[in-house]
Amino acid sequence: MAEQTASGYIQHHLQNLTFGHLPNGEWGFAHTAAEAKEMGFWAFHVDTLGWSVALGLIFVLIFRMAAKKATSGQPGALQNFVEVLVEFVDGSVKDSFHGRSAVIAPLALTIFVWVFLMNAVDLVPVDWIPQLAMMISGDSHIPFRAVSTTDPNATLGMALSVFALIIFYSIKVKGIGGFIGELTLHPFGSKNLFVQALLIPVNFLLEFVTLIAKPISLALRLFGNMYAGELVFILIAVMFGSGLLWLSGLGVVLQWAWAVFHILIITLQAFIFMMLTIVYLSMAHEDNH
């Protein structure tokens, strides 16, 4: 990428490997952001899908391995690690979830580990995975983003899944009438039926915005933090390619400093996503407003 400008380098690293309907009528991979944009809605971010599935499988395999090797005697390092993680998540669920459900704890564990693994890919040097993709494909211009959580499609997809569970449990616990009443009869109420009828549109607007804000904030918080972190790594990488010795030296220091700080960010963002999911589902299980 030595021939690229700093701007071109940054744009290339922030572009997804997109598969879809090309302008010439064929199906294939986009090589530029303009081609990807022309593909429209029915385009697939292959890198995001691939890494999300791969890291999900890694999570399943690690925990399956730990379960198969679990023993009541002297536990190994993997069993100790998994037990500590499970106890941590279980404690978080017990502290924040006030309903009864056998699904919430496994869901919270899955979310925390999966999001953490997707975030952790950000610690891999920014050029390694794209360069590997170029070597495998034989195309020196093909884009490839490895951090799935820097793609709003991934974070919004996870958030919408949580939103679907919120709606499902709200209706299951409160009934369809109770769910509709929650959206239309609160926060403002009146014993006068005429006044209450007038307040329904206001209540619905306020409650609907509150409801929709949950998945949007959940998705954008994770995306924004991880996208900003990835951008910092890319800007530091630009320093290395500047050709200036002092700037390259500064880049080395910043790379290590930001990587250490980023470990906190990737863990914290996974924890926040998990905790908000637990809190939102706990609210859905509450039988009163």
Curated annotation (Swiss-Prot):
The keyword Cell wall biogenesis/degradation does not apply. InterPro entries: ATP_syn_F0_a_bact/chloroplast, ATP_synth_F0_asu, ATP_synth_F0_asu_AS, F0_ATP_A_sf. Keywords: ATP synthesis, Cell inner membrane, Cell membrane, CF(0), Hydrogen ion transport, Ion transport, Membrane, Transmembrane, Transmembrane helix, Transport. The keyword Cell inner membrane applies. It is a multi-pass membrane protein. One of its GO terms (biological process) is proton motive force-driven plasma membrane ATP synthesis. The chain crosses the membrane at residues 43-63, 101-121, 160-180, 193-213, 232-252, 259-279. Pfam families: ATP-synt_A. SUPFAM superfamilies: F1F0 ATP synthase subunit A. It is found in: Cell inner membrane. GO terms for cellular component: plasma membrane; proton-transporting ATP synthase complex. CDD domains: ATP-synt_Fo_a_6. One of its GO terms (molecular function) is proton-transporting ATP synthase activity, rotational mechanism. Key component of the proton channel; it plays a direct role in the translocation of protons across the membrane. F-type ATPases have 2 components, CF(1) - the catalytic core - and CF(0) - the membrane proton channel. CF(1) has five subunits: alpha(3), beta(3), gamma(1), delta(1), epsilon(1). CF(0) has three main subunits: a(1), b(2) and c(9-12). The alpha and beta chains form an alternating ring which encloses part of the gamma chain. CF(1) is attached to CF(0) by a central stalk formed by the gamma and epsilon chains, while a peripheral stalk is formed by the delta and b chains. HAMAP family: ATP_synth_a_bact. Belongs to the ATPase A chain family. This is ATP synthase subunit a. The gene is atpB.
